[in-house]
Amino acid sequence: MSQELRDEPPEETQERYDRKLTITSMFQGKMIVTVLSPIQAVAAEAAGAAAVIPINHIKMFMERIEGPGSNRSTELSAINSVMDRVLIPVIGRVRAGHIMEAKAMEAAKVCCIDEHELINPITTTYIPETNQYIAFKDGPDGAYGYAHKTTKMRIYKQPFKVPFICGAADLGEALKRIQEGASLVRTAYSVDDDTHDISKTFEMVRKINDSIAEIVNGDDVRLYTLASTYDVSIELLRMVKAAKRLPVPFFAAGCIFMPIDVAMLMSMGCDGVIVSTRVFKAMCPETRLNDIMTAIKHYDDPVQLAGIIERAGGYGPMPTVNG
């Protein structure tokens, strides 16, 4: 925690966090679209997207050379080119734990920062002989010749003026990210979004919902036990119990490009979705994006869903990114 934040009255920290929550709350009931170009960003804006996330044009090329996990943060030039073309908010992605990268994104005037778990995260290694934590770019367990567990660093988000979006595979991760200052939680990516299995997204949403139900139905003793298990404050668990949901917007992410899947995720309690770039592989991306917005707004209307299934050509998958 920075010296400035330690000296800051708690009311000011809370006021700044409330402002960030106001921004991310505006995304509820809408879609955020990942894009590879300004042209795709314009199409997303026209379809009603709440925001866009530019990602690297050379991402797939670099993965072919260096293998999975070689993703880089998006170049600021690509972000600026999207900002010049659209009026909706633009979200910048940074490596998990990379504070300076996040500061650079904030200076670039992005609306939000997505602390992404798959773009070469910064990790820490505990060296027992020296009683120190060593930070290094994503590396294998057992580095430095010691048997240890490597863990990912996370950015402490409260000092930032822009809101953060963070991924979570379960409720424990979601609550930790919120305690760090995240203003929107999405489901985590198990692999790159282009190859992520949509069933894993459904599984994570169900898992988080089941854990929330456990909190809602638990007594104070159970809450204290869960607070210790999750390593979060009891006050945060009480907020979840009172609201019967996460205290921040909750989005589904990972291989989302089929409107009928979006309808299912919304029916499960998601506040919105982050759409994969795979949507632009559809024969008519504009129609597909419009259908996703329809699925978000009318997920409980079977007549509307029948129409979007017909336009999508059934339930089956679209061609792969290389097809």
Regions found by a protein language model. Give the residues of each.
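Alpha/beta enzyme core
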Residues: 2-323
